[in-house]
Amino acid sequence: LGPCFLPEYRDPDAGHLDLASVLLSLAAVLLTIYGLKQLAEHGAGLASMAALLAGLAVGALFLRRQGHIAYPLLDLRLFAHAPFRAALAAYALAALAMFGVYIFMTQYLQLVLGLSPLQAGLATLPWSLCFVIGSLLSPQLAARWPAARILVVGLSAAAFGFAVLGLGQGLWWLVPATIVMGLGLAPVFTIGNEIIITSAPSERAGAASALSETVSEFSGALGIALFGSVGLVVYRQALTSAALPGLPADALQAAGASLGGAVHLADTLPAWQGAALLAAARAGFTDALQATAWAGAVLVLVAAGLVARLLRKRPALASG
């Protein structure tokens, strides 16, 4: 039905794919994420700093190339539009925070609260349902109120949800927090995406849509890597500072690699020692979840500030 009801627009001046730009962007992403993971795993060593600096350098080369070739992979001219910049930044920060916290939340439900995979999935179902509800309501809201107001309110509500998750622990804190987060973030991925596409010239709408999708995927991957690195540092610090008498240094190092490793190691130790290790590991992972939740709250508040500043004069979107 798509070809019959969806009119297609083709850019008559579309150029060829620049393979060098593809390779540069891929190298920049991989080097940066590798550097972040090495930084969390081994500290500020030669490998981590070299990878991060190399990733930044390759990223700079990529951006420089985009400004000098006829058919860039990333059209920097799109960023001249303030609504485009604001919506894309909010989109990126929201995805970064959401994916970064979610990776900890699923482990927390199973390895700290002891839920089965099915129970953990059911515990996250309210978040998903509220996200769907918020997405379905967003077009009606956007037809009545300015997009900036909806996005700022949604991002502020999401920040409150992240903060609630960072303040408490247990299932009865987590589920209400994720409900608020889902309702608040939904407009960012619906209204925000529409602003990204409609802010671009018609001949660049495809490029804007592709950039929106790419930013979402990249921000999600970066959120997992960045928040995972921060959370791992918090978890290890809590585990190292815990009183665990008689636990060998190599066992403590293995437990510090991941919560799953600590749970597995606890099963091989004497009962009293395994219980102490498991309690310390679960407390440390709870600290890590709360730290990443607060980081997520800060990020979405920054996104709300950007939207409030750059989208002040944008009217309500047309209905439909």
Can you describe what each PLM-predicted range is?
Residues G59, A159-F160, V300-A304:
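Small-residue-rich packing faces within the transmembrane alpha-helices of Major Facilitator Superfamily
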Residues L36, L109-Q110, L141-A142, V230-Y235:
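Interfacial helix-cap and linker-helix signal at transmembrane-aqueous boundaries
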Residues R204-L211:
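Cytoplasmic loop-to-transmembrane helix junctions
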Residues A120, I150, A208, T292-A293:
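Alpha-helical transmembrane segments of multi-pass secondary-active solute transporters
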Residues E194-I195, V215-R309, G320:
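Hydrophobic transmembrane architecture of multi-pass small-molecule transporters
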Residues L1-A90, A97, L115, A123:
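Hydrophobic transmembrane-helix bundles of small-molecule transporters
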Residues L30, L136-Q140, I191, A221, ...:
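Residue-level hotspots within transmembrane alpha-helices of multi-pass secondary transporters
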Residues A20, A47, H68-E203:
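Transmembrane core module of solute transporters
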